[in-house]
């Protein structure tokens, strides 16, 4: 019962602490001018401990990398199974990406930007060679969660990743250690599968994900949104000159 769960959590935490991430073949830098130095304004890179979470299960899965596998199957010419060591042999890259929850309210905190280290999903899918009639990938988590992602979003130039690192460290356990999906430009409900173990290449007219089966739209592109951080909500603003600062985002598309 609870003793087994706590023992498993301690074991996986120890494995994570001892893990050394591979060096990325490419990195993305954040311009120094992006940090404006305004007190109260959210930093460009969200600390991992402050990054938002949306969970659909009561228990956080504890997955040892030695036991992890990823199966790619469905409408493909060649089924592929990858283990942790296989994933590490592929060329990892680091990218800066913003994730946001579709249920983030105006002024809400369900958004974060991190440095993600991982293997491009397009390279993994290329090994399986999806058939011409496929248009969706149904990803599955070890806890049963599913997300339906447009195939083109996983294979274009947006650097959708099978992520293994976050902000220079192995993924936090609660954020999907050892492997999760990160897809810039899509809301999490159709892309951000944590503890991912399966990619089923399929079609929208044949399958649906956890949230789309509950009435949410199929493709979930991130829409333009903004937030005022300074002054904070409810703060008293004195007469005279005041600083107003915030953030805006539309990942993959960009804001100009």
Tell where the protein language model's regions lie, with residue ranges:
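N-terminal export signals
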Residues: 1-11
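Structured, non-membrane catalytic/scaffold regions adjacent to prosthetic-group chemistry
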Residues: 10-256
């Amino acid at each position: 019962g609870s003793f087994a769960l706590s023992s498993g959590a301690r074991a996986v935490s120890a494995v994570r602490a001892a893990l050394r991430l591979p060096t990325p073949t490419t990195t993305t830098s954040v311009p120094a001018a992006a940090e404006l130095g305004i007190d109260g304004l959210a930093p460009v890179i969200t600390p991992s401990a402050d990054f938002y979470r949306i969970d659909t299960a009561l228990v956080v899965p504890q997955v040892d990398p030695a036991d992890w596998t990823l199966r790619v199957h469905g409408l493909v010419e060649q089924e592929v199974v990858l283990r942790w060591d296989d994933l590490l042999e592929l060329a990892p890259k680091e990218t800066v990406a913003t994730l946001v929850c579709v249920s983030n309210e105006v002024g809400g905190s369900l958004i974060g930007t991190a440095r993600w280290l991982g293997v491009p999903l397009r390279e993994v899918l290329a090994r399986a060679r999806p058939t011409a009639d496929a248009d969706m990938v149904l990803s599955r988590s070890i806890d049963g969660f599913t997300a339906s992602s447009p195939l083109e979003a996983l294979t274009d130039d947006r650097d959708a990743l099978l992520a293994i690192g976050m902000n220079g460290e192995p993924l936090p356990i609660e954020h999907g250690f050892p492997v999760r999906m990160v897809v810039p430009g899509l809301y999490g409900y159709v892309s951000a599968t944590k503890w991912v173990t399966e990619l089923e290449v399929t079609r929208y007219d044949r399958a649906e994900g956890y949230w789309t089966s509950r009435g949410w739209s199929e493709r979930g592109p991130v829409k333009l949104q903004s937030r005022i951080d300074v002054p904070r909500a409810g703060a008293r603003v004195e007469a005279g000159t005041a600083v107003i600062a915030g953030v805006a985002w539309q990942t993959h598309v960009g804001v100009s």
